Structures are given as C-alpha cells and as structure tokens.
Amino acid sequence: MPALSPDSPAPNSPAPDSPAHQILRDVFGYGAFRAGQEEIVATLLAGTHALVVMPTGSGKSLCFQIPALVQGGLTVVVSPLVALMEDQVAALKLAGVAADTINSSRSYEVNAATWRRSAAGEVRLLYLAPERLMTERMVDALHRLPVTLIAIDEAHCISRWGPSFRPEYEALSRLGALFPETPIAALTATADAATRNDIADKLFDGKGRTFVTGFDRPNIRLAVEVRRDAKRQLLEFVGARSGQCGIVYCLTRKKTDETAAFLAANGIRALPYHAGMDKADRNRNQDLFMTEPGVVMVATIAFGMGIDKPDVRLV
C-alpha cells in the first residue's frame, strides 16, 4: 500500500467549512490540520480502513476523534493501558466531548453505568482494553449498537515482527470479520515496513490505505557516552538538568529501586516504577510524574507506552 508523503495533496479532503473543519476549530481549538491529518480524516469518513504512522505528538488521535464526532454513532477505541485511556477520556471531556471508558480500575457500578450511557447513545467514544473488547459478551453487545468506527491505538502491539508484541492484541485480527461494515483506524508511532504490512494484513487483509508522515523528531537529540562510573555519570547527567522532568530506564526491578533511592538520596526527586510494585504505589508515582514538575521516573520498560507529557526533557 502506498505511503503518504507529508506534502501529498489531499484531493478528497474536507472542505474548509466542512463539519470536520468546524470540529477541529470549535472543539479542539486548532485553526488548520497538520500534515496528513486531513486526508486520513477523509479516508475514514469514506468508510475506508487506514493505517496511520505518525510521530508522537503529531496529532494521531485527532485522526479518529474528528470522524467520530462528524458521523455520530459510537466509536470504539482500543488502548493497551488504563492510564492512557483515563488520560484521553479526561482530555476529551474537558473539550466537551462525550467520551468514557470501561476498564479494570473502575468499579462494577461505574462500568455498568458507562455501558448504560453508551447503549443509550450518550457516549461518542468508548475506550476499551483489547481483552475486554474481544469477549463474546462485549462483541454481542456492540453488535446491537451503531458502531461507526473502530480505532486501535498502539497498533504495533499486534505484530510479531516488533518488540512490543502483546498476545491480547492478536485477537483484534478478528475485528474485520466481526464488524465487516465498520472502518478500522490503526495508529502507531513505531512501525517499519514489515510491521506496517503485518498490521494491515491482520486488521483489514491489507485492504486499506497506509499513511506515513515520517518518524523524525528534530527536537530530540541522541547521545552516547562511554560507561566509566555509571552511578556518578547518571547523577551528573540528571543533576545538570535539575528541576527538569525525565525518565531513567533500568533492566531489573531491583536496579530500579536501587537507582531511584540513590538519586533521591542525592537530592533528585526520583520515583520508582515497575511491575513488582503495589498497583496503588505505581499509580501514585505515575500521577505525581504526570502532574508535578521536576519528577524523574526510574522505571523498567513497564513504564512509558502512551505517556503524554510535553515537558519530558531527558531519557
């Protein structure tokens, strides 16, 4: 499938006074689409599947959120992380959008109330984890509703070609057969050519359009330093950026705890995050990282996917 260059024309794009442009301006507060967004929106509104590869921070979510609001009905959004679902729902609600989520962090009563609102047509975007979406009960329930779009965030998780493969995502390959009349938007910031082909084949048998607007982030600088005294080098690196938000990755849980304690003992506001921690402690540390300045998260690879924080200055 051909990729879209950032400078490609968009002959089927919404007109400047179209509902898509009005929602972009009035709901989300943007005067114009970014490169690629306009044609992706038009593609989904035309009922065509789309694989979208765009850098982080480039507005991937708008590519499905705007069609969701233009065409009505219910858009189902698949996301791998509860924290990401909650963040996106909160942001949409602030913009006045009827969005909600059913997830494992919420009580049965809250989830049941969300479903009742969804079934009554009061929710426009419903965020679900892949394992919840693909249950027989949920699929049957959604078949009774006007599902007009399915969006899959972090779509690279479905591909065995990539390092981020998640088994629960593999079940999403049945979506095309289960919802044959519903366009699917697959979105990722991380997919080489082999991974892109794998995603498109699994989600819509390759029958869709692929949009690649590039991977380069010119505001990111990569540097390599020879390891001599790792702890001293780390402290100097982080300390030289005092008050800035960052992430330090470690290979093991033990090393994560030790490094966080070391940095904290040296005046750095460092917090640990790994899968071996109590869930409440993990969530508390993530909330502090997301909401307060100058926090350095010391973590395993359990942390990071879907984190939307504009002031991260070091990794």
Give the location of each predicted region.
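Helicase motor core with emphasis on the C-terminal RecA-like subdomain
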Residues: P2-P6, P14-V27, G31-A35, E39-L51, ...
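Hydrophobic positions on the alpha1 helix immediately C-terminal to the Walker A/P-loop
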Residues: C63, P67
